[in-house]
Amino acid sequence: MTDNNNLAKGDLSPLPFSPGKVMKRRMKDIHVRKKAIKIYMIKIYSNMLNTWFHDLYDNLPNHEPRYWHIFIGTNNKYAVALPLNDKRASSIHKTLSEFINKYHPAKLTSDEEPGFLANIQLLKDNNVTMHVIQDKNHSSLAVIDRFIRTIRDMNTVSEESKHQSHEEKYTYISPYRMEKILNTYNNNYHSTIKCTPQEMFNDHNLEKEYILKCMDRSERQKRIKDLILPVGSFV
């Protein structure tokens, strides 16, 4: 009799491998093939002085301002926030103009926010390079994304506070509170840049030194064999 006939007659003899054993064998094979990969930190930096990221912070409806136009230095991590009533191109034109006139950026990097794209000519007229990150590539926007998360974290109740997180003042950021947050952030030591954002913002030599260190590290990382993961690597 064939195996099929045996099965038809109700042959319940055990299979060579049970589903559980097959899965264990597969997992074992995976672990055998898996190669340990060292962790490498790839810093986002600019080899130009005075370059910035910018984005919009949603301050929720029925609050003043409705949005915050956030800027943060690519290298020095110095942060600026300007109040914004809406996301219209004309309103963003005003905050961009204010920022450009005061800080004279060499380059501004952002996502594809329509109000930013509508103001390309403003940047051109002021000799500001515009870099747009497409397809929501938030890895390239990590600096500004991380800072916006930091703002939210700084606007929460501390463990020692008697206040509650649902209280009105913790649901949005008022101009007074934003000023306090920025002052604290800009004057706190950052291990990434080995100084405070305010110090590097005030001293271009510190930024130049930081750029040189990042460039040197980047060149050394390029010589690492397993820096670029092959297709199929476990991460």
Question: Where are each of the predicted segments found?
Answer:
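Retroviral integrase
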Residues: 2-153, 191-235
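Globin-like tetrapyrrole-binding proteins
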Residues: 136-137, 147-183, 196
